[in-house]
């Protein structure tokens, strides 16, 4: 910001504070009390849209409304202002002889951004605009800082994220997005409830960081003198509930990963995880298709949407393809016929796929997929058959034990869901954890730790179970055409200002 702009802002701050002093000297509280509203600007728009000027004059409907001043014009003993509540504006017509000399003096002191309460009657102007003719004016809160330019809002994208309250005042698209986010969460819960799932809550503080390959945030419990981790997934506690006989459960909650930020990643984000006893990953595919298509239809009125440059059809009957097949399709490498880790490494070298020391056949297949295939999957696609090495909690495939009964959902080149037939063999699970521990020793700091308590729970018997994880934030991005995860998080994590 230039020095000139700084000086202008400072001048406005001084003037507004002087007005506060003036009001207090007159015995008026610039930061008022409760105000009872009988109607909102939006409701006035909706209820009286079809009423003529003459009908409104005859009805003389008295209302009480409140909102933030967005425009103001004063000419002698008459003034006009538009107030905004959420993102609906209403014109207020103010006459000195109608509200009284003292109240009119307060109105003249009002600035853009001030919050006011109005009592009056609804009428329609000569130009046809629904308005309220004020009979009473109340200052409810004085704005000490000027709002951003009403025509351009916040031009600085980072400022929109840091000062979301200003973004919501000045940017209708942003406010609508967060209303849609709320509806998406509601409709998601409605759908899961309709499928017989029970919503539960599980701990945020874990003694072991498990359920996903990610770096945790670490904290310390003073009274117990022990390290705890902010959860990186919801999975392991929810599966304990399946062991306990709660056959269908889900949770929508925050998880935390101590990793980088990007347009798709925030250190804390919202996950939906669900688990259903006596089901498998194919049942979960059906659940995901139904959930996403239903919620999309409810919030957008259609299952055909636009995301950025792409037209996406979320109508059910999505493509289902094995990871090895889709790699062969896009890259021309047939991993079905790769018989050794060494052969896989040679293929990686030949195709410029970056690998590290701990990587074996399954890791390398996944690297091929992520390098050459993932971003090309625009229409909804279930990619299944993930290798055992990268799926420590998933059940092995009976026909080929190199792979698991796991899938990920890809839309517009991004992962939107991860699911599998849960591994319920405690002996196999222990061996998988041990293999993960070896990977950690070789430098894979995202490898899963040993969770003895979870293993003990499995030993009591986990029925065949289909498990699901959906990144709620990415789903909201998709359904609202948001280019960045920060656009759909009210208060995204931001680096300290310099």
Swiss-Prot record:
This is Lysine--tRNA ligase. It is found in: Cytoplasm. One of its GO terms (cellular component) is cytosol. It is an enzyme of class 6 (ligase). One of its GO terms (biological process) is lysyl-tRNA aminoacylation. Belongs to the class-II aminoacyl-tRNA synthetase family. Coiled coil: none annotated. NCBIfam families: lysS_bact, PRK00484.1. Its main location: cytoplasm. Its EC number is 6.1.1.6. Its cofactor is Mg(2+). The keyword Magnesium applies.
